[in-house]
Amino acid sequence: PGVTGPVAVADAFATTWSRGAAFDLRRGMAMMVFELRQVRRPTGVSGQPRWARPEEVDLLADWVDAFNVEVHQTPRPSLEQVRERVLERIHSQNVLVWEDEGRPVSLASRSRPSPRGTAINCVRTPPAYRRRGYASACVAELSQRTLDDGKLFCTLFTDLANPTSNHIYGEIGFESRGEFVELHFD
């Protein structure tokens, strides 16, 4: 159990919740929440975007599972649970793949739609394909498609300890809106 939210709110909740309790409070990931209202697409990135296909579910589920490991997802869903979620998102056109030379090289998905916005999440480029701009191009394209669908904005959470991703998302047009924190009750 735990809480995730804006730093001041999460800290206040944790302090109140833990009064007289027999558990330790552990800080998890420090995050930045970003908002995008206008996309700046990267240039010079090889490949093209497309919606993920059902026959790719096993490959993409492996990528999402690896993403969950990298971000220390707690609790971590089973690979079968990941596969089911990925397939649901594929069928609802919520997983975008960046493809280069006929093969998927990056993915980004979207979730938590509201009347005005949608969250971009689970951005993953396998290590062999990193540092080529694929993730930036994929996120920019998915964000633009989301805006084209009538949403006013996209949101995205990043790990504050990863300056590379924070910089990349800023280049695409995401603007920081505040720090969030995960707090765990052990």
What would you call each of these model-derived segments?
Residues 6, 60, 120:
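Residue-level signal for inorganic ion chemistry
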Residues 121-127, 131-148, 166-171:
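Conserved acetyl-CoA-binding loop-helix of GNAT-fold acetyltransferases
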Residues 107, 177-179:
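Residue-level detector of high-confidence beta-strand sites
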Residues 1, 15-16, 137-153, 175:
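Conserved acyl-CoA
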Residues 39-76:
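Short amphipathic alpha-helix that is part of the acyltransferase structural core
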